């Protein structure tokens, strides 16, 4: 029937649905809608005017069928092409008890019939402040039966009453709600999903009106689990040729929604009557084809969006060949290392000494040899002589290094199979080069490794990198909170998954404030007593009502002088994909009001066998201290 179905957004094609309030002949309508190019149909499960009475006789026992037969469509069509809609008269949060009780019964009847049909999704309206009973009825429905429908909450981007043009200017308006204006509808949603305990089955169908809110409100919505965007035909403008188009502001919003792979639902009558209705859909296709192309980082990260991974522990574990292979493909990292080594060699060896001064260069953690090759290229580029040691503790990777030496490098490179902290070097190094950084800079124990190796660095020797700093930023993300919650393991503390960091390509999230520096390490470390434990307090101003789910971690490093690498969004090295950000979750989401400050405390702790992080929020409210004593997560020395 249709090329794609509900939940089928992906690839370059826009996935779209048609929203109708009345469907007399379902099979014919579905055929017509598919012909126009739509993938699914949103329609009431029951006739909108067929109000049922569940409480009082005699209407309670009205004869005849309650709604159309399921036999009108095949099971597969119900499963993939129809999104159910709740009858508009159903108001489970009515203050009138009879209406409320009747609505509850009718809502359950419609939800149960939707489950019986196997509908992939059901559309329910959120159009007022108090939706508590709606949340209870829906949550009870989700927890009974074995159905798997998604529930799309239809939320307006801007509340309809805020668009009324009959309000007299400067006249006092009566606001009964705690939040007004742009904040209102997000608070409806936030309170509703909190009541539903962040159920993964409940998502947003965001209705976009002619007026758009400010950018920070849109940014916040894009951190929510938006599965569909509802576009009324009335928001489309008309171009010179009579076709429907959207304003520049709306286009920018559509581009951002396309990145989240939402499905689009067109609602309303044809406002461009001389054109076919499918022209609305064709315009969305046009926008999809003409959106900015993905950059190298986005292409590499495709498929990893919001996918949680445990951080690597290359000190404790030996990496696999494929892991090395992925990192070696990074086009930026090794060219920056080569540039840093090149500059360092020129700085250490004057032109007149280039034939006599041989610099001893040690690659610590050589892996399969990319830094050795970068060093050799740098020496050639600088026209300087070097003697190279490639030190690697992974015996499997050493095999690759020895093959390189035999086939390419020759006597210029000495391969050493040893842990750099235990190696007794035959001579001291002029330059030590390493790539031991993780997504949070020091989380793969670069400080401990380089401190253990610096005794064979000359007093005037150079470490590349010379310095690195971790950064933290507060984020809101329903998606990531639910992903972490789902990581619960059978034999562990039920909240252990919230006490460990995850490497993740952040996608469906909202950053609440700019990243701030956390811990800095410098090499060589000339302190008489080296201590890599740290404690920092960071305060983040927040300009919007929101909810805190955790902290994104990034890093910047100075390789040598002005040669840097960064995954901090503001300074991200273009095209570099070796590191995704790190996520530090918190156990309980924390509501944050506009103008409040988020205060977080971070500790880096260690003993003789391991290193770990602890963290706690202390404003606007206090959280528990996460991961005390490293009980849920440590990094092995």
Curated annotation (Swiss-Prot):
A protein binds at residues 327, 435, 444. PROSITE patterns: SAM_MT_PRMT (PS51678). Residues 13-292 are annotated as: TIM barrel. Coiled coil: none annotated. It is found in: Cytoplasm; Nucleus; Golgi apparatus. Disulfide bonds: none annotated. It catalyses: L-arginyl-[protein] + 2 S-adenosyl-L-methionine = N(omega),N(omega)'-dimethyl-L-arginyl-[protein] + 2 S-adenosyl-L-homocysteine + 2 H(+). The modification N-acetylalanine is found at residue 2. The keyword rRNA-binding does not apply. The active site is at residues 435, 444. GO terms for biological process: circadian regulation of gene expression; DNA-templated transcription termination; endothelial cell activation; Golgi ribbon formation; peptidyl-arginine methylation; spliceosomal snRNP assembly. SUPFAM superfamilies: S-adenosyl-L-methionine-dependent methyltransferases (SSF53335). Forms, at least, homodimers and homotetramers. Component of the methylosome complex, composed of PRMT5, WDR77 and CLNS1A. Found in a complex composed of PRMT5, WDR77 and RIOK1. RIOK1 and CLNS1A associate with PRMT5 in a mutually exclusive fashion, which allows the recruitment of distinct methylation substrates, such as nucleolin/NCL and Sm proteins, respectively. Interacts with PRDM1. Identified in a complex composed of methylosome and PRMT1 and ERH. Interacts with EGFR; methylates EGFR and stimulates EGFR-mediated ERK activation. Interacts with HOXA9. Interacts with SRGAP2. Arginine methyltransferase that can both catalyze the formation of omega-N monomethylarginine (MMA) and symmetrical dimethylarginine (sDMA), with a preference for the formation of MMA. Specifically mediates the symmetrical dimethylation of arginine residues in the small nuclear ribonucleoproteins Sm D1 (SNRPD1) and Sm D3 (SNRPD3); such methylation being required for the assembly and biogenesis of snRNP core particles. Methylates SUPT5H and may regulate its transcriptional elongation properties. May methylate the N-terminal region of MBD2. This is Protein arginine N-methyltransferase 5. It comes from Macaca fascicularis (Crab-eating macaque).
């Amino acid at each position: 029937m249709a090329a794609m179905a509900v939940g089928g957004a992906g690839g370059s094609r826009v996935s779209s649905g048609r929203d109708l309030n009345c469907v007399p002949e379902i099979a014919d309508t579905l055929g017509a809608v598919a012909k126009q190019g739509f993938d699914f149909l949103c329609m009431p499960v029951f006739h909108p005017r067929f109000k049922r009475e569940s409480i009082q006789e005699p209407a309670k026992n009205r004869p005849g069928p309650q709604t159309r037969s399921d036999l009108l469509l095949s099971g597969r069509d119900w499963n993939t092409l129809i999104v159910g809609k709740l009858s508009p008269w159903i108001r489970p949060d009515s203050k009138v008890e009879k209406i409320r009780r009747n609505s509850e019964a009718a809502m359950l009847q419609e939800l149960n019939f939707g489950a019986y049909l196997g509908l992939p999704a059901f559309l329910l309206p959120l159009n007022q402040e108090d939706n508590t009973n709606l949340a209870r009825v829906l949550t009870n429905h989700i927890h009974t039966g074995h159905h798997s429908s998604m529930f799309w909450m239809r939320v307006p981007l801007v509340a309809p009453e805020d668009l009324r043009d009959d309000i007299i200017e400067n006249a006092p308006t009566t606001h009964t709600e705690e939040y007004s204006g742009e904040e209102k509808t997000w608070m409806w949603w936030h309170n509703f999903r909190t009541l539903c305990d962040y159920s993964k089955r409940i998502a947003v169908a965001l209705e976009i009106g002619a007026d758009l809110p400010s950018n920070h409100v849109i940014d916040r919505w894009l951190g929510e689990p938006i599965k569909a965007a509802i576009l009324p035909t009335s928001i489309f403008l008309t171009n010179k040729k009579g076709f429907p188009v959207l304003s520049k502001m709306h286009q920018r919003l559509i581009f951002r929604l396309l990145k989240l792979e939402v499905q689009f639902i067109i609602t309303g009558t044809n406002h461009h009557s001389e054109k076919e209705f499918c022209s609305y859909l064709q315009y969305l296709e046009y926008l999809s084809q003409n959106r900015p192309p993905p950059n190298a980082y986005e292409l590499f990260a495709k498929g990893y969006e919001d996918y949680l991974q445990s951080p690597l522990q290359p000190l404790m574990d030996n990496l696999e060949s494929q892991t090395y292979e992925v990192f070696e493909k990074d086009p930026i990292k090794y060219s920056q290392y080569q540039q840093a080594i090149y500059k360092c060699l020129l700085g250490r060896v004057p032109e007149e000494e280039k034939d006599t001064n041989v610099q001893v260069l040690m690659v610590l953690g050589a892996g399969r040899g990319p830094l050795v090759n970068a060093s050799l290229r740098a020496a050639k580029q600088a026209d300087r002589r070097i003697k190279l040691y490639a030190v690697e503790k992974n015996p499997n990777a050493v095999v690759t290094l020895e093959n390189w030496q035999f086939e390419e490098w020759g006597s210029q490179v000495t391969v050493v199979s040893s842990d750099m902290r235990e190696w007794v070097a035959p001579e001291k190094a002029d330059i030590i080069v390493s790539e031991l950084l993780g997504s949070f800079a020091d989380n793969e124990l670069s400080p401990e490794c380089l401190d253990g190796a610096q005794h064979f660095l000359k007093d005037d020797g150079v470490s590349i990198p010379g310095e690195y700093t971790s950064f933290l930023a507060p984020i809101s993300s329903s998606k990531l909170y639910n992903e972490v919650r789902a990581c619960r393991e059978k034999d562990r503390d039920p909240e252990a998954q919230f006490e460990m960091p995850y490497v993740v390509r952040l996608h469906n999230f909202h950053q609440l404030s700019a990243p701030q520096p956390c811990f800095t390490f410098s090499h060589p470390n000339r302190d008489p007593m080296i201590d890599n434990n740290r404690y920092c307090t960071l305060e983040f101003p927040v300009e919007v009502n929101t909810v805190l789910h955790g902290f994104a971690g990034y890093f910047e490093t100075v390789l040598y002088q002005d040669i840097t690498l960064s995954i901090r969004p503001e300074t991200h090295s273009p095209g570099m994909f070796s590191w995704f950000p790190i996520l530090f979750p918190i156990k309980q989401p924390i509501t944050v009001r506009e103008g409040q400050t988020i205060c977080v405390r971070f500790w880096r702790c260690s003993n003789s066998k391991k290193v770990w992080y602890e963290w706690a929020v202390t404003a606007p409210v206090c959280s528990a201290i996460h991961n005390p004593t490293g009980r849920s997560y440590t990094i092995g020395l």
